């Protein structure tokens, strides 16, 4: 390890810790939705709208930094980001506690604030890690994204234990606790050297810039498809196991969601230690995702379907970070703008796929042909709908296989 690498070790750890601490933004609110419904009388529709607000805010931040990157100081923004997370979570907890009649306004305000921080996290943490001197930058990127999964598991376990031991009436104390963790990120970033980051890609000529832009567009398509393949199962694994496989909810949550997350984290850490040949990894990941979705939907054996659902976490684990690694390999010094655009593509995939799966499931379950098929197969229309939804989700990695093959040919031709 050279001197330059050593001097930035603290910076790398700051990025790792920040990704870990930021996971509370995504995993804590859903754990509290039932509490908010019972204590404040907020409908599930309005609570679900908070998830949409979270996504739309992050996407807005991604797009702002895609088109207006030059107006922002990346180092100041990076140091301010954890403070926004803390502020958002404190607002999320304080306004409903102090003004119960304004609870939903507090939840919306807090969600907007910490979602801005989440968007900034997506835009700036990856290029910061990529800009650090390293002997294995692709492994550092994989490790960064694996820590998000560990963060989710940690938040779920600690929060569930807290609410069970102390009661849901103290949810605001739990939220305040998670709000304190990002302060450590702020301290680390303020006391660590930050690398210079290109705001936009540097091109030698107009023709070269055109090739880079097309290559970046292909990477955005790839991360959209990869994110869709991962998040369709992430959002539906528990419901699918409960409705289509008739497993108890606790099994769907523990053996489903938790095992899915654990395999996702494990695969990313394995790549962080041993990884290479990212294009091949992405190709086999897409193929594996197609097989897992089809087996989960079509297998007549519950155990096989359950294993396929869980294994989706392993095979899709590298599709998001792996596409970032691919972009960094093929487009040197891509700039913060490129990372913002990639984050926007990933966020779109994370939103579109679960929504499409839900729409397909509802429409198929309500159809006449599904009712007739359900009778002949001794299933319910809802089961048929869920299985068709899973088959539909397999379309994303199917297209992804073609996209990866095209990307491989494109960069081989234009390298």
Report each predicted region and the residues it spans:
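Helix-to-loop junctions at the C-terminal end of transmembrane segments
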Residues: 61-76, 163, 266-279, 361
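C-terminal transmembrane helical hairpin of 12-TM major facilitator-type secondary transporters
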Residues: 278-326
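Intracellular juxtamembrane helix-capping segments at the cytosolic ends
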Residues: 120-133, 318-332
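Symmetry-related core transmembrane helices of the 12-TM Major Facilitator Superfamily/SLC fold
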Residues: 172-190, 387-406
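Cytoplasmic helix-loop-helix junction between adjacent transmembrane helices
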Residues: 110-146
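C-terminal ends and interior cores of transmembrane alpha-helices
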Residues: 83-101, 288-300
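Helix-loop-helix hairpin linking two adjacent transmembrane segments in secondary transporters
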Residues: 135-136, 143-197
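Extracytoplasmic gate region of multi-pass secondary transporters
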Residues: 29-31, 212-266
């Amino acid at each position: 390890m050279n001197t330059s690498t050593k001097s930035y070790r603290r910076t790398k750890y700051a990025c790792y810790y920040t990704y870990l601490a930021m996971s509370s933004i995504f995993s804590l609110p859903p754990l509290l939705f039932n509490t908010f419904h019972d204590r404040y009388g907020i409908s599930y529709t309005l609570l679900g709208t908070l998830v949409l607000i979270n996504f739309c805010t992050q996407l807005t931040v991604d797009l702002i930094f895609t088109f207006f990157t030059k107006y922002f100081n990346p180092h100041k923004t990076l140091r301010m980001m954890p403070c926004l997370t803390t502020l958002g979570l404190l607002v999320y907890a304080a306004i409903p506690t102090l003004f119960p009649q304004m609870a939903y306004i507090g939840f919306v305000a807090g969600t907007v604030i910490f979602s801005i921080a989440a968007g900034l996290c997506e835009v700036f943490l990856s290029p910061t890690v990529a800009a650090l001197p390293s002997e294995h930058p692709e492994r550092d990127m994989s490790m960064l994204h694996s820590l998000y999964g560990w963060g989710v598991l940690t938040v779920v376990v600690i929060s569930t234990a807290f609410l069970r031991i102390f009661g849901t009436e103290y949810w605001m104390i739990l939220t305040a606790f998670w709000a304190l963790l990002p302060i450590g990120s702020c301290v680390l970033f303020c006391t660590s050297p930050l690398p210079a980051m290109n705001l936009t890609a540097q091109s030698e000529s107009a023709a070269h810039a055109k090739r880079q832009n097309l290559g970046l567009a292909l990477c955005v398509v790839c991360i959209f498809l990869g994110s869709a393949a991962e998040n369709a199962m992430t959002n539906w694994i528990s419901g699918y196991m409960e409705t289509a496989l008739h497993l108890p909810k606790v099994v769907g949550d523990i053996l489903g969601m938790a095992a899915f997350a654990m395999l996702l984290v494990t695969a990313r850490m394995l790549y962080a230690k041993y990884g290479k040949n990212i294009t091949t990894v992405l190709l086999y990941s897409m193929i594996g995702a197609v097989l897992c979705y089809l087996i989960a939907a079509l297998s007549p054996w519950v155990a096989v379907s359950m294993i396929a659902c869980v294994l989706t976490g392993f095979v899709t684990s590298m599709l998001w970070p792996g596409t970032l690694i691919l972009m960094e390999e093929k487009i040197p010094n891509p700039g913060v703008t490129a990372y913002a655009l990639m984050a926007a593509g990933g966020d779109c995939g994370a939103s579109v796929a679960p929504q499409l799966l839900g729409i397909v499931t509802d429409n198929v379950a309500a159809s006449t042909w599904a009712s007739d098929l359900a009778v002949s197969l001794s299933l319910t229309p809802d089961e048929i709908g869920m299985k068709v939804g899973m088959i539909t989700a397999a379309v994303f990695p199917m297209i992804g296989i073609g996209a990866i093959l095209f990307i491989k040919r494109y960069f081989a031709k234009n390298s």
